[in-house]
């Protein structure tokens, strides 16, 4: 036997020794446990399947799983019943008239049972290693090769099936576009984008509701750990904070470091300690490289990429990031679980669109119901804590339920002061959490009322943790500092939705004005739709405002048309030697000019009288009107000065119609019918 063969045999023996399973062994997830059991089965010489799994009725998450030898059970049991002796729901072997003959059942009892703990980790509860049939110890490699080939064939088939299932049917594109068009009619800022292949297969659909961000860029963006996404976010949202999902980043460990994890059981725990146990960036860097060097992985390319992108996912680098409920450590299934209620795997595209709208509508109704409960129902206090009493009056019912869990959890925490900086009112505590079986570091600055905990619950969820509250209580504080009460979780959260345009000047562009009005309309629609009375009141106000604006628009249009008429059709009267020839012909001409001037004012006056209310605000005081008319009367006081009066009338005509101040808000008190009456009186006096 060559040295290479000897080393391979020794490596296989070493791997088998490290693949031994005992009760109490822990895993990060159900998938990791199953992958480990498959490796164990391959090393021993048998194959395994997932026989059963169970979800929690409360949360819908997996809490139990059972992996068995493929010869587990008997043919009769599999065909006749779907319930195992241990209470799990076991899939029946008979499907669509066929019997599963993939392997011979020998009623083998070998299995592995894992269960999910409260902290999310999975632990081995029970197992049976003995088989009642022959195992193929010498054919483990062949089994692995065969298993890999079957997986590849199964994967290829699934891909083909998925591609076929995504091909659009006749009318689907039209339905989709109609759906998006209707959404845009309801909400002008609704955005969508469709990506189709050359074969008319659907590749991607993207749409977003305008109410999600009110037209503002996102402050924080969470994505998977991907370099292309990293570059894309930097290009599109350069000022947003980009973070990676921790569940995705660390979830790649079994794949990237599986060969090391199987040999070194403490690797995962030590990496987690370096990530979560570091209070400063310097501490993390030191602890990280100690772990990497201890397990001789400094040359690992994947770990190098994680370290280079540490500011995107390591908690200690995200102290300034407020995720406000978005979780990076665990995958959020809220959207998927919500859709599962309305759609199934075989749901048609048309049915999906209908069910999606139904889901959104029910979500809105649930939010309205929750708002009503918050306003009219007081949450029950389960603790005499002053923090609980304080926030019961401030938080919404749903948020207070979450907050009260932390209040009650404070009884399991024991704080101990570690240090205090001289000259600065800053103290550091180490809080032992006996419920989570971990210790956390809390820093309290009494001068600035700033409290920071290494668990980072406030940054992740938006409310203070039990560790921070126990330190506040120990320091004599009886209320939570205001900076740790986010308004988005309070009863008056709606009042925060003040448009930015209320505080800053709207840019004088049509697009900006249109955007501002749409945002205001959205807010008004949300409030007015709460009751029929508010709806009717708002509709009446909107109709009245629309009529007023139409009348104002018509008036301005008439003034502009009058300006055009006087500028083009009325000749300019030229005077010579400051004398006025009062012969008949000139009188006729003057009458024509006088009539044109009257017509201009009459059209405007009749328009305003027909509208029955003043379009231009009546801000002009009596003194201002008297002063202005006094000037006109003074011009007419001397009958021999009729010529100059007539000139001033023409001057007034041109000035009144063409002067830009007519269209300014500050001159909106100008009343054409009043001026027309004054001009008539003045002409009578002259005659």
Swiss-Prot record:
Q: Which residues form the FAR1 domain?
A: 35-137
InterPro entries from the UniProt entry: FAR1_DNA_bnd_dom, FHY3/FAR1, Znf_PMZ, Znf_SWIM
Q: Which domain of life is it from?
A: Eukaryota
Q: What is its main location?
A: nucleus
Keyword set includes Phosphoprotein? no
Example GO molecular function: zinc ion binding
Q: Which UniProt keywords apply?
A: Coiled coil, Metal-binding, Nucleus, Zinc, Zinc-finger
- Coiled-coil residue windows: 540-562
One cellular component (GO) term of this entry: nucleus
Could you provide one GO biological process annotation from this protein's UniProt record?
regulation of DNA-templated transcription
Q: Where in the cell is it found?
A: Nucleus
Matches recorded under SMART domains:
ZnF_PMZ
Xref: Pfam families: FAR1, SWIM
Zn finger (SWIM-type) ranges are: 440-476
Q: In which tissues has expression of this protein been reported? A: Expressed in rosette and cauline leaves, inflorescences stems, flowers and siliques.
* Similarity comment text for this entry: Belongs to the FHY3/FAR1 family.
Purpose: Putative transcription activator involved in regulating light control of development.
Tell me the PANTHER family matching this sequence. Answer: PROTEIN FAR1-RELATED SEQUENCE 1, PROTEIN FAR1-RELATED SEQUENCE 10-RELATED
Give the protein name, as stated in the record.
Protein FAR1-RELATED SEQUENCE 1
- Taxonomic source organism: Arabidopsis thaliana
């Amino acid at each position: 036997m060559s040295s290479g063969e000897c080393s391979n045999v020794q490596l296989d023996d070493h791997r088998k020794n490290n693949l031994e399973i005992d009760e109490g062994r822990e895993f990060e997830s159900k998938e990791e446990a199953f992958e480990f059991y498959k490796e164990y089965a391959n090393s021993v010489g048998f194959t395994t399947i997932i026989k059963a799994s169970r979800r929690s009725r409360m949360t819908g998450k997996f809490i139990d799983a059972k992996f068995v030898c493929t010869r587990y059970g008997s043919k009769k049991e599999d065909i006749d019943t779907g319930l195992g002796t241990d209470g799990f729901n076991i899939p029946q072997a008979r499907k669509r008239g066929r019997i599963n003959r993939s392997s011979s059942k020998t009623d083998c009892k070998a299995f592995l049972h894992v269960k999910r703990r409260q902290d999310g980790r999975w632990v081995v509860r029970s197992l049976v290693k003995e088989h009642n049939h022959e195992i193929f110890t010498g054919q483990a490699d062949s089994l692995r090769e065969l298993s890999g080939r079957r997986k590849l064939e199964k994967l290829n088939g699934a891909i083909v099936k998925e591609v076929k299932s995504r091909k659009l049917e006749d009318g689907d594109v039209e339905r989709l576009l109609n759906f998006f068009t209707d959404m845009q009619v309801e909400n002008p800022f609704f955005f969508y984008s469709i990506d189709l292949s050359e074969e008319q297969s659907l590749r991607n659909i993207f749409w977003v509701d305008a109410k999600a961000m009110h037209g503002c860029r996102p402050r924080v963006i969470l994505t998977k750990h991907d370099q292309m996404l990293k570059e894309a976010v930097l290009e599109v949202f350069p000022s947003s904070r980009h973070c990676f999902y921790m569940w995705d980043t660390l979830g790649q460990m079994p794949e990237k470091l599986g060969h090391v994890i199987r040999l070194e059981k403490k690797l995962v725990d030590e990496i987690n300690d370096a990530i979560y146990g570091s209070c400063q960036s310097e501490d993390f860097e030191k602890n990280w490289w100690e772990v990497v060097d201890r397990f001789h992985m400094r040359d690992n390319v994947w770990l190098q990429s994680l370290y280079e992108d540490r500011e995107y996912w390591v908690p200690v680098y995200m102290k300034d990031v407020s995720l406000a409920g978005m979780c990076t450590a665990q995958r959020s299934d809220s959207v998927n679980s919500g859709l599962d209620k309305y759609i199934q795997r075989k749901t048609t595209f048309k049915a999906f669109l209908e069910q999606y709208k139904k889901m959104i509508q029910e979500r809105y109704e649930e939010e309205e119901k929750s708002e009503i409960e918050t306003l009219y129902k007081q949450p029950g206090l389960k603790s005499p804590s002053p923090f609980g009493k304080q926030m019961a009056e401030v938080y919404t019912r749903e948020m207070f339920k979450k907050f009260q869990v932390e209040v009650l959890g404070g009884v399991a925490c024991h704080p101990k002061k570690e240090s205090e900086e001289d000259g600065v009112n800053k103290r550091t505590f180490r809080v032992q959490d006996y419920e989570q079986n971990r210790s956390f570091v809390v820093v309290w600055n009494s001068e600035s009322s700033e409290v920071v905990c290494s668990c980072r619950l406030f940054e992740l969820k938006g409310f203070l943790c039990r560790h921070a509250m126990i330190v506040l209580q120990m320091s004599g504080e009886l209320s939570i500092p205001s900076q740790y009460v986010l308004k988005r979780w309070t009863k008056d959260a709606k009042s925060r939705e003040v448009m930015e345009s209320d505080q800053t000047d709207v840019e004088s562009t049509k697009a900006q004005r249109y955007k501002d009005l749409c945002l205001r309309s959205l807010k008004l629609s949300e409030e007015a739709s709460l009751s029929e009375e508010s709806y009717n009141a708002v509709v009446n106000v909107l109709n009245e405002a629309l009529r007023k604006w139409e009348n104002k628009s018509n008036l301005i249009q008439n003034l502009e048309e009058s300006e055009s008429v006087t500028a083009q059709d009325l000749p300019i009267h030229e005077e010579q030697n400051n004398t006025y020839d009062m012969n008949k012909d000139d009188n006729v001409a003057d009458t024509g000019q006088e009539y044109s001037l009257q017509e201009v004012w009459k059209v405007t006056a009749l328009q305003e009288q027909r509208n029955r209310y003043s379009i231009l605000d009546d801000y002009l005081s009596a003194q201002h009107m008297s002063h202005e008319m006094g000037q006109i009367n003074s011009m007419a006081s001397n009958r021999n000065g009729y010529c100059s009066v007539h000139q001033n009338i023409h001057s007034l005509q041109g000035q009144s119609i063409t002067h830009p101040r007519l269209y300014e808000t500050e001159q909106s008190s100008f009343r054409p019918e009043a001026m027309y009456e004054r001009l008539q009186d003045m002409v009578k006096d002259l005659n």
